[in-house]
Amino acid sequence: MDKFSQSPPLRDDLVRGSSLNWTKEKENILKGPFNYLESHPGKDIRSQLIAAFNAWLDVPEESLNVIRRVVAMLHTASLLIDDVEDNSQLRRGIPVAHNVFGTAQTINSANYVYFCALKELAILNNPAVIQIYTEELVNLHRGQGMDLFWRDTLTCPSEDDYLEMVGNKTGGLFRLAIKLMCAESPSHNAHPDPFQRNDYVPLVNTIGLLFQILDDYKNLSDTIYTQNKGLCEDLTEGKFSFPIIHAIRADPGNLVLINILKQKTTDDEVKKYAVAYMDRAGSFSYTRKVLRGLTKKALTQVDEVDAGRGRGEQMKTILEKLRVDRNHQRGVLTPAAGGASIA
């Protein structure tokens, strides 16, 4: 008898590719970075938006729970990847996951959760949701890819290109949630002609732009944001955010700001100088003006979607929370000597 015939047989589950021996302990290992970040929740604007849109869509609770889980999973997983790609140090006031678990394990955890979320959607037994999921995950990666390209090549995008990127990256997860809800809403699908159904996408696109530009604004001007993510983190990342793009394009011949971005500085005084420069360029006042315009547009879209049904109050409450004048901090960041404060 040769030595190979004496070898123990392979377990049947290994031969057949069964996952019966996949244990909770192994699952926790893979999801470690994901669970770490998930245990420190953010403000969860996405759940609030789902609840507000559901006042119109009336999605069955069982389907809505699946959608909530999927959106939460994707959001947290995308933050894990964002923090790696941006070399961030803090997220929600705690060390980023890749500084705790390592970069490779964090990337794998996030990618794993993307597919776990897809498996969750299969519960709905609706082919349309898989198409929606794929489409918006493609959009998310397109947006992220352009954002990274501009940063890594020190290329200042046009405002239109930036808004397109935001529509793909930030708007993608917002749209994903609402499109999934529409696919699972009996009342929404009751009309036989799809072109006669309410279109919620323009509203959610506006909210995505509003949310991201407000986030850009707060990153450079908000003390609470500084506590959670660090002082003017966008400058340290070398990111072309909305106010930064305005300041650079307001005076293309002045290379001060673009050189500060190139340095990816951690020097607080340099960052405060950059903020003062943007303030003098009118970039913060311009950003506030754009945000007010987006809020006004969103409120108009709420009334159009509601069409007199009286179900838009939750959405208006959310928009009130996102109003820039509620988030505007005065005189937060000033250089140690000289320079203008935020007006």
Swiss-Prot record:
Disulfide bridge partners, by residue number: none
Residues noted as binding isopentenyl diphosphate in the record, renumbered to the chain: K43, R46, H75, R92
Site (Important for determining product chain length): Y114
Binding residues for Mg(2+) 3: D215
Enzyme class: transferase
Gene Ontology BP annotations: alcohol biosynthetic process; isoprenoid biosynthetic process; mycotoxin biosynthetic process
InterPro entries in alphabetical order: Isoprenoid_synthase_dom_sf, Polyprenyl_synt, Polyprenyl_synt_CS
Keyword Lyase: no
Binding residues for dimethylallyl diphosphate: R91, K169, T170, Q212, N219, K229, K239
Ligand binding (Mg(2+) 2): D82, D86
The reaction(s) this protein catalyses: isopentenyl diphosphate + dimethylallyl diphosphate = (2E)-geranyl diphosphate + diphosphate; isopentenyl diphosphate + (2E)-geranyl diphosphate = (2E,6E)-farnesyl diphosphate + diphosphate; isopentenyl diphosphate + (2E,6E)-farnesyl diphosphate = (2E,6E,10E)-geranylgeranyl diphosphate + diphosphate
EC number per UniProt: 2.5.1.-, 2.5.1.1, 2.5.1.29, 2.5.1.10
Binding site for Mg(2+) 1: D82, D86
An annotated Gene Ontology molecular function: dimethylallyltranstransferase activity
The record's free-text note on cofactor binding: Binds 3 Mg(2+) ions per subunit.
Described function: Geranylgeranyl pyrophosphate synthase; part of the gene cluster 4 that mediates the biosynthesis of an isoprenoid secondary metabolite.
Family: Belongs to the FPP/GGPP synthase family.
The protein's name: Geranylgeranyl pyrophosphate synthase 1
Species assigned in the record: Zymoseptoria tritici (strain CBS 115943 / IPO323) (Speckled leaf blotch fungus)
